[in-house]
UniProtKB/Swiss-Prot annotation:
UniProt-annotated stretches for the region Contains the Ser-Pro(4) repeats: 432-727
Composition skew (Pro residues), residue ranges: 397-419, 446-457, 466-479, 492-677, 718-727
Annotated GO biological process: cell wall organization
Protein name: Pollen-specific leucine-rich repeat extensin-like protein 3
Pfam family for this entry, one: LRR_1
Main localization (coarse): secreted
Tissue spec: Expressed in flowers, stamen, pollen, and pollinated carpels.
Signal peptide: 1-22
Compartments, record wording: Secreted, Cell wall
Annotated Gene Ontology cellular component terms: extracellular region
Length: 727
C-alpha cells in the first residue's frame, strides 16, 4: 500500500486503525442526537449563539459557528488537522479556504473545504449548512459516518462535492439535486443504498461517481439525458438492462458498469458513443452476441466485456478499432474470432480471449461446458434490453400447456445441464450480483427479464408450469455469480487521499481522457477538476491487480479502474461451484426444501403423476413439508407418493408415481393444487409442479435458461440492509 500514497500522505501508511462497527454506530447516533427537526436549520440560528468575538463580516461569523460545531463532531483526528480550528480567523483554519464573495468582491467568505486524506472520524453537523458560500467540499479518504444532513441544501453555490471513501450511509444524498451549479459528484466507496434518483442524470454534471456502494434497482432511463463525460456504476447491485437511451450521451468519455447484476443483450445504441474511450461491462450477466453497431466506437481505447455469458463471434472490425489499446473478452462463450482478435496478432493491442469456447486456442472452456450455452443461443431481436418484444417465451409456454405433461418425465435429465452452467469460471468472477437476487425468488421469474413476465404467469397457470423448469436452470446461473465479496471490495481503497489540491475544479472533464491508459492517474484522479484530487484512488488499493486494465478509468475513475479489469481472471476458480448442480439428482429431495428449489424444480416435474401431492412440497421449503403432504393426501390420494417422488424421477421410485395414476386426474384436480398453493406462500410453485413435472424439463428451459440469467428483475438484494449495523 505505501506506493499508493504521495509524499504529503506518506505518513498515513496503515498508521491509524479503522473504525469498528460499534464506533461507527456510536458516531451515527451522536449525529442523530444533534440534528434539528427535519434536519434543517432555522434561518436565525446564528443569533442563538452567544459569541464574544468579532468578525470581519456576518458570513465569516456563520462559518465560525459551523466549523466549531464540526470540530465538536470529530471523534478522531489522528493528524490533528483541526488542531488550529479556534478563534475568529476561520480563513486560517487548516483545510478551509477563503475567497472574495461572488456577489461582493470586497467581502471575504469561506469558499471551500478540503480535508482530503485527513483520516478524520466523525460526522457532519447540520450547522455546516450555514456556510452558504462554499463551492468546493472535499472529504475523500476520511472516516466520516452517518448521513449527509438535509441542511446541505442551503449550499447553493456547490460546484464540487467529493465525500468518497468514507463510511456514509442511507439513501442517495438527494441534497445534491438541489444544487443548481454542481458539476462534480463523487460518492464512491461508501455505504449508500437504495435507488439512484432519475433526476441525477438530468443535471448538468461533468462527472458522476457512484461505484462501490450498495445501490440497487435498475439504471434509470434518464441516463441518456446526462451531460457527464464520466459515469461509474461499478461494484453495486444494479440489475436490469443498460438503458437504450445511452446512445444519447454525446459527451460521454468513460462509463463503467462492472460487477453488478445487469443482463440481457447489449443495446445497439451503444454503437453511437463515438467519443467513448473506456467501456467496461465486465462481471455481469450480459447475453447474446455483440451488436454490429459496436464498429462505431471509433474512440474506444479500453473495452472490457469479460465475465459475462456472451456468445457468437468477435468481429474483425472491433479488434481493428483505430484507437483500441486493450480488448478483454475472457470468461464468456465466444466460439469464433477474427484473425486480428487473436492475442499476439497485434503488438499495439492487448487482447485476452481465455476461458471462452474458441477452437485451437489455449485455456478455453471444456466442450461440455460450452455446449450448455452455445446450443441455446439467445435471440437478441426478441430481447427487451436490445429493444425486442421478448414475447417468444410466453408463446412457448402456452403451446406446451396441457399436451406435454405426460411426455416430459424424461426431461428431468436436463437439469444436469444447468449444472454445467455456462458461467462457472465467470461465477467466481462476479462477486455479489446474482446470489442476493436469486434467494428471493428461486422461481426465477424476474431473472428472465425478456421472458420472465410471461414465463411466470404461465407457470402459475395450468400449462405455463412447463416453463418453471427453466427457472430452476436459472438458479445455477445465479450460483455462478461471482457475487462473493463486493462489499469487502469497497473498504480497501482508503489510501488515495491526495486530494487537497482539488480546489481547481475547472479540470473536470479533461482529466478523464488523458488519464485513461496510464495507471498513474489514480493519484491525480481525485476531484475531477484537479487530476490530483482524483487520487482518491482508494479503489486502486482494492483492485490493485486490475489497475493496468482499467487504468483508463483512473482519469476520472481511478478507483474504479483498478476495480475493473483484472478481477475477472481472479475469480476463474468459482466455476466449480456449478458443477455440483449436476448431482442435483441425488439431492432432489432436499431441492424441494428451498435452497435448491431453482435447480431441483426439474425433478419435481418428473413426478408429474403425484403432482397433487407434490404441490405440498412447496411448503416443505418452509420446512413444514410433512403438514403440506398430509393435507394434500386427501385430494391427491396418497401423501407417501410425494416422498417417493423425489427419487422416482431417476430410479425405482418412479413406479410409485406411476401407481398414482391419479396424475391424469391430477389435471382435473388442478383446482386442488391451487388450494394447496393457497396455504403455502409459494402457491405458484405448487400448482405448476403437478402439470409441469413432465413439461418442466422441456426444451423451453434450455432455450430460456440462457436468457433468464440476466437477473433483470431482481431488486430484492436483502443482503445490503444487514450490512448497516447500528443505523
Amino acid at each position: 500500500m505505501p506506493h499508493i500514497y504521495k509524499q504529503p500522505l506518506g505518513i498515513f501508511q496503515g498508521f491509524v486503525p479503522t473504525l469498528t462497527d460499534a464506533e461507527v454506530s456510536f458516531i451515527a447516533q451522536r449525529q442523530l442526537l444533534t440534528l434539528p427537526e427535519n434536519g434543517e436549520l432555522p434561518d436565525d440560528i446564528e443569533y442563538e449563539v452567544d459569541l464574544k468575538v468579532t468578525f470581519a463580516n456576518h458570513r465569516l461569523k456563520r462559518a465560525y459557528i459551523a466549523l466549531q460545531a464540526w470540530k465538536k463532531a470529530v471523534y478522531s483526528d489522528p493528524f490533528n488537522t483541526t488542531g488550529n480550528w479556534h478563534g475568529p480567523h476561520v480563513c486560517g483554519y487548516t483545510g478551509v479556504f477563503c475567497a472574495p464573495a461572488l456577489d461582493d468582491p470586497d467581502v471575504a467568505v469561506v469558499a471551500g473545504v478540503d480535508l482530503n486524506g485527513a483520516d478524520i472520524a466523525g460526522h457532519l453537523p447540520a450547522e455546516l449548512g450555514l456556510m452558504t458560500d462554499v463551492a468546493m467540499f472535499h472529504l475523500n479518504s476520511n472516516r466520516f459516518c452517518g448521513i449527509i444532513p438535509k441542511s446541505f441544501e442551503k449550499l447553493s453555490l456547490m460546484h464540487e462535492f467529493d465525500v468518497s471513501n468514507n463510511r456514509f450511509v442511507g439513501p442517495f444524498p438527494s441534497v445534491v439535486l438541489s444544487w443548481p451549479a454542481v458539476k462534480f459528484i463523487d460518492v464512491r466507496y461508501n455505504d449508500f443504498e437504495g435507488q439512484v434518483p432519475p433526476e441525477l442524470f438530468k443535471k448538468d454534471l461533468d462527472a458522476i461517481f457512484l461505484n462501490n456502494n450498495r445501490f440497487t434497482s435498475t439504471i434509470p432511463d434518464s441516463l441518456g439525458e446526462s451531460s457527464a463525460s464520466v459515469v461509474t456504476f461499478a461494484h453495486n447491485k444494479f440489475s436490469g438492462c443498460i438503458p437504450r437511451s445511452i446512445g444519447n450521451m454525446k459527451n460521454l468519455n468513460e462509463i463503467i458498469f462492472k460487477d453488478n447484476s445487469l443482463g440481457g443483450c447489449f443495446p445497439s445504441e451503444i454503437g453511437k458513443l463515438a467519443n467513448v474511450n473506456v467501456f467496461d461491462a465486465s462481471m455481469n450477466s450480459f447475453t447474446g452476441v455483440l451488436p454490429p453497431s459496436f464498429v462505431g466506437l471509433t474512440s474506444m481505447e479500453e473495452f472490457d466485456i469479460s465475465g459475462n455469458k456472451l456468445t457468437g463471434f468477435i468481429p474483425e472490425n472491433i479488434c481493428k478499432l483505430p484507437k483500441l489499446v486493450n480488448l478483454t473478452y475472457a470468461y464468456n462463450y465466444f466460439n469464433g474470432q477474427g484473425d486480428s482478435c487473436v492475442p499476439g496478432s497485434q503488438k499495439q493491442i492487448a487482447l485476452d480471449d481465455t476461458r471462452n469456447c474458441l477452437p485451437d486456442r489455449p485455456k478455453q472452456r471444456s466442450a461440455k461446458e460450452c455446449a450448455v450455452v452455445i446450443s441455446r443461443p439467445v435471440d437478441c431481436s426478441k430481447d427487451k434490453c436490445a429493444g425486442g418484444s421478448s414475447q417468444a417465451t410466453p408463446s412457448k409456454s402456452p403451446s406446451p400447456v396441457p399436451t406435454r405433461p405426460v411426455h416430459k418425465p424424461q426431461p428431468p435429465k436436463e437439469s444436469p445441464q444447468p449444472n454445467d452452467p455456462y458461467n462457472q469460471s465467470p461465477v467466481k468472477f462476479r462477486r455479489s450480483p446474482p446470489p442476493p437476487q436469486q434467494p428471493h425468488h428461486h422461481v426465477v421469474h424476474s431473472p428472465p427479464p425478456a421472458s420472465s413476465p410471461p414465463t411466470s404467469p404461465p407457470v402459475h397457470s395450468t400449462p405455463s408450469p412447463v416453463h418453471k423448469p427453466q427457472p430452476p436452470k436459472e438458479s445455477p446461473q445465479p450460483n455462478d455469480p461471482y457475487d462473493q465479496s463486493p462489499v469487502k471490495f469497497r473498504r480497501s481503497p482508503p489510501p488515495p487521499p491526495v486530494h487537497s489540491p482539488p480546489p481547481p475544479s475547472p479540470i473536470h472533464s479533461p482529466p478523464p481522457p488523458p488519464v485513461y491508459s496510464p495507471p498513474p492517474p489514480p493519484p491525480v484522479y481525485s476531484p475531477p477538476p484537479p487530476p490530483p484530487v482524483y487520487s482518491p484512488p482508494p479503489p486502486p488499493p482494492v483492485h490493485s491487480p486490475p489497475p493496468p486494465v482499467h487504468s483508463p478509468p483512473p482519469p476520472v475513475h481511478s478507483p474504479p479502474p483498478p476495480v475493473h479489469s483484472p478481477p475477472p481472471p481472479v475469480h476463474s476458480p468459482p466455476p466449480p461451484v456449478h458443477s455440483p448442480p449436476p448431482p442435483v439428482y441425488s439431492p432432489p429431495p432436499p431441492p424441494v426444501h428451498s435452497p435448491p428449489p431453482p435447480v431441483h424444480s426439474p425433478p419435481p416435474p418428473v413426478h408429474s403423476p403425484p403432482p397433487p401431492v407434490y404441490s405440498p412440497p412447496p411448503p416443505p421449503p418452509v420446512h413444514s413439508p410433512p403438514p403440506p403432504v398430509f393435507s394434500p393426501p386427501p385430494p391427491v390420494h396418497s401423501p407417501p407418493p410425494p416422498v417417493y417422488s423425489p427419487p422416482p424421477p431417476v430410479y425405482s421410485p418412479p413406479p410409485p408415481p406411476v401407481k398414482s395414476p391419479p396424475p391424469p386426474p391430477v389435471y382435473s384436480p388442478p383446482l386442488l393444487p391451487p388450494k394447496m398453493s393457497s396455504p403455502p406462500t409459494q402457491t405458484p410453485v405448487n400448482s405448476p409442479p403437478p402439470r409441469t413435472p413432465s413439461q418442466t424439463v422441456e426444451a423451453p428451459p434450455p432455450s430460456e435458461e440462457f436468457i433468464i440469467p440476466p437477473f433483470i428483475g431482481h431488486q430484492y438484494a436483502s443482503p445490503p440492509p444487514p450490512m448497516f449495523q447500528g443505523y
